[in-house]
Amino acid sequence: MTAMAAAAVGALWLPSLLSLSLPGPAASIRTTAEFVKRCVDEHNRLRSSVSPGAANMLLMSWDAGLAKTAKAWSKTCKFKNNPHLKIKGKGHPFFESIGENIYVTSGKFSVEEALKEWVAEGIRFNYDKNTCLKKQNCNRYTQLVWGDSYKLGCGAYHCPKGIEDFKMTKGTIFVCNYAPCGNRRGQLPYVKGAPCTYCGPDFCRDKLCKYPKWKPDFGSASISWSKCLLLRTSITIMYILW
C-alpha cells in the first residue's frame, strides 16, 4: 500500500473512531509512555511463559491505530463488545481482523490486574483437546496467548456516571485490541514446542519470535472475518467488586 493510499484509508477511518466517543463527564486514563510499556511488557511476559511452551509465539508491539480504537470504545462507557470491529475498515485502516478483550472494575485499576484476570482463564483450557471446561470461558486467555497476534493497542476510561450494562454506579473499562485476531474457529492458540522453533535464533527474543514485517500492507495483514470469533463470547467480561 502506497503512502498516499494509506493516508486516504486513514482519513476515512478516523471519523468513524470519533463517532464512537460519547460526550459527558468522565475521567480519561491517559495513554502515556508508561501505560504503553506496561501493556506491551505484561503481554509479552505472559506470552513467553505459556504452558505448554510455544514454538511460534510472536513478540507483540504497540499499534497506535488499535489503541485509538480501543480508547474510543472505552469512552462510550458501554459494557459490551465493539460492533464496529465486525465491519472491514472500521477498526483499523490496514488490519481486517481485530480481536478484543475487555475488563471492567469498580475498584482501583491496573494493567497488571486486568491481564491477571485474563490469563487466569488458562487453568480452564485444555491445550491438547483445544477445549475449555464445560460452561466456562477461556476466550480472553486464548486471545492473549494467540501465537499469530503480534500487534496490540489498549485504552482505559473511568466512567463516574456509570457504565451501560454494568451493575455498579461507576467503574473503569480497559479494552485491548489485537491484530491479527485470535480465537479463529478450529485452531489452537499456538503451536506447541520449544520456544522460537518456528523462527530461529536470529528472530528470537525472550522466547518470542519477532515478526519480520512490523508494518504489513493491507493484503498481508488480512484474515477472513468468517474465521474470527468476534462475538460477545470472544470478549467475555469479569466483574471485580470491591
Write out the residue ranges for each language-model feature:
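Mature extracellular or exoplasmic CAP/SCP-family domains and secreted bioactive peptides
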Residues: 2-242
